[in-house]
Curated annotation (Swiss-Prot):
It catalyses: CMP + ATP = CDP + ADP; dCMP + ATP = dCDP + ADP. InterPro entries: Cytidylate_kin, Cytidylate_kinase_dom, P-loop_NTPase. It is found in: Cytoplasm. One of its GO terms (molecular function) is ATP binding. Keywords: ATP-binding, Cytoplasm, Kinase, Nucleotide-binding, Transferase. Coiled coil: none annotated. GO terms for biological process: nucleobase-containing small molecule interconversion; pyrimidine nucleotide metabolic process. The gene is cmk. This is Cytidylate kinase. Its EC number is 2.7.4.25. GO terms for cellular component: cytosol. Its main location: cytoplasm. It is an enzyme of class 2 (transferase).
Length: 226
């Protein structure tokens, strides 16, 4: 990793608002963007497409090594291209998310994708969105943020998103899924979900996105000036 390229990492649990924050930060700073969670979803989706067991390291490592994925920014969105196909919508399905969390718990698969993630570091800078960006992937990042929110608040946000799409879902089911994913991510043996020791921890439970962006930018600008 080059010490010359400024890297901003944003870690945190699912539904805390990392994607929105990272998109806005990358636009305001003019930096490249990496959605590491999408990479795991892409691998999980590739496994599903190719009939590969999402819990088999032996089968997943070769797939991860040769994963053909691109991130293409368009307007306020980042299109994810897998093997030439836009899979952005398919990546957001609950089935894909649960499979991705299983994939991310496998040590050799994480190792295979680590080099791919680090290759996104390029001038003028990078905003990296994930769960272990500041602790594992970019431990020397100039600025590290851990964005959190209560499980209940994250379930409410997800409920609204799905209802806005016309889907019939239950709050209790979403809350249980989020709590199960949190437990799996926080207690996995490799790269468990936790703030880096030198990270700014932001709890977005009662904050607007504008407030989160403002606090994050103040912190980032102070770190980049050091």
């Amino acid at each position: 990793m080059s010490s010359q390229t400024p890297v901003v990492t944003v870690d945190g649990p699912s539904g805390a608002g990392k994607g929105t924050l990272c998109m806005l930060l990358s636009k305001k700073l003019g930096f490249q963007l990496l959605d590491s969670g999408a990479i795991y979803r892409v691998l999980a989706l590739a496994a599903i497409h190719h009939g590969v067991d999402t819990e088999s390291e032996d089968a997943l490592v070769p797939l991860a090594t040769h994963l053909d994925v691109q991130f293409v920014a368009e307007g306020d969105l980042v299109k994810v291209i897998l093997e030439g196909e836009d899979v952005s919508k398919e990546l957001r399905k609950e089935e894909t998310g649960m499979a991705a969390s299983k994939v991310a718990a496998l040590p050799r698969v994480r190792e295979a994708l680590l080099r791919r993630q680090r290759a996104f570091e390029a001038a003028p800078g990078l905003v990296a969105d994930g769960r272990d960006m500041g602790t594992v992937v970019f431990p020397n990042a100039k600025a590290k943020i851990f964005l959190d929110a209560s499980a209940e608040e994250r379930a409410h946000r997800r409920l609204k998103q799905l209802q806005d799409k016309g889907l019939d879902v239950r709050f209790d089911d979403l809350l249980s899924e989020i709590q199960e994913r949190d437990d799996r991510d926080r207690n996995r043996p490799v790269a468990p979900l936790r703030p880096a020791e030198d990270a700014l921890v932001l709890d977005s439970t009662s904050m607007s996105i504008d407030e989160v962006v403002e606090k994050a930018l103040q912190y980032i600008e102070s770190k980049l000036a050091e």
